């Protein structure tokens, strides 16, 4: 199969992606503080709740609801990235911009330029467990782990650096993308009634202007 390579530069891709994000799903660089920021449940600090395992949120990714045989991860890469070539029905060669670093990412760096991709839980599973998910029924934990609102394709290096940290311990390396990140995290926390520490809440508010 002939691989379709992008004809635009990384800079052009970044500018185009930023414009699209401002107009559609990821208003990076043009957002204001989410209303969810005022609705956060705060606790003095994050305490470790014993018993966390990845399998408490399901054995891997859930199945796609629209493409039989594919996974939720496959769906997220398909919708959040630009498909360059249909090398595989579930996992095409795709490219995009990491919403944490602003750098080009690729689902297959050997075939299309960009850093390797991982799919990140914006509100990490381990952190969610500590902040209340330990008490959820399995069905709710499965839904949380596979909720598209909590999933984002990012550079592997950013995801590894973040690990299970919340904002008082980690923020995106690109400072212009931090408001978007904490807004997303606040929305998820409010939706799922997850608490954040006072330190996390303070850092989150600091990243976004009022309005």
Predicted features along the sequence, with ranges:
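Alpha-helical interaction segments
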Residues: 41-43, 112, 171
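Betabetaalpha-Me/HNH-type nuclease active-site subdomain
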Residues: 45-154, 159-163
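A near-ubiquitous, low-amplitude feature marking generic local secondary-structure context
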Residues: 13, 35, 134-138, 168
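N-terminal module-boundary/linker segments of secreted carbohydrate-active enzymes
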Residues: 2, 22-70, 198-202, 209-210
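C-terminal, well-folded lobe of enzymatic/effector domains
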Residues: 2-13, 17-23, 28-29, 162-211
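Residues that form generic nucleotide/phosphate-binding pockets
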Residues: 39-43, 75-79, 128, 184, ...
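Detector for methionine-enriched segments
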Residues: 1, 21, 37-39, 76, ...
